[in-house]
UniProtKB/Swiss-Prot annotation:
Pfam families: Se_S_carrier, TusA. The active site is at 17 (cysteine persulfide intermediate). It comes from the Bacteria. This is Putative sulfur carrier protein aq_1421. Belongs to the sulfur carrier protein TusA family. PROSITE patterns: UPF0033 (PS01148). Disulfide bonds: none annotated. InterPro entries: Se/S_carrier-like, TusA-like, TusA-like_sf. It comes from Aquifex aeolicus (strain VF5).
Amino acid sequence: MENVKEDRTLDLSGLSCPLPVVMTSETMRKMEEGQVLKVISTDPGFERDIWSWAKQSGNILLKVEKEDGKTIAYIKKASEAHEPSLWYWIKFHSLGVKLHIRQFCIQINPFVKKPTHFITFSAISEGTRAEKELKKLGEKDAVLIPIPDEIDPRCGVVLAVHGEKKAREIYEKLKDMDIAVEAIYEKKGKEYERVYP
């Protein structure tokens, strides 16, 4: 599939997560079945995000190209496509704002032990589910925050924990609950190193 003829182009250069996926979803929702949207993005996590979004929405990702630091995606509207509503994206964006504020509060509060270990998830929904399940169990040693760019530049969340022993304990507990945990990273200076599994 060398040449793909797009019906519409959406240049989202300069916008960061989650806006490229939100605007792509809203544009696709208004397109007709079979039409092709060309999306241009400079967000470093856009390629992985758009693959995931296409799979979830039922649209067809025809091809992805890299050119001059930009990711260019060609997406075909499928008949069975089901893009999330604008209300869904508003709730998603407000979650991001809430998590960034939470992260900032942890950083500036001198009375809180700073997290040293970070548990990653296969999806944001798994992270929010993990937080809810841990709250039910009375677990207060893990805080859901945005994933550091050094671990993954895409939109995502991590559970921030102080201490590797506690992080492993929570990781195993979540795994036993069938929550899609991926790994534990340890912060070492400005770097993050995968330490488990």
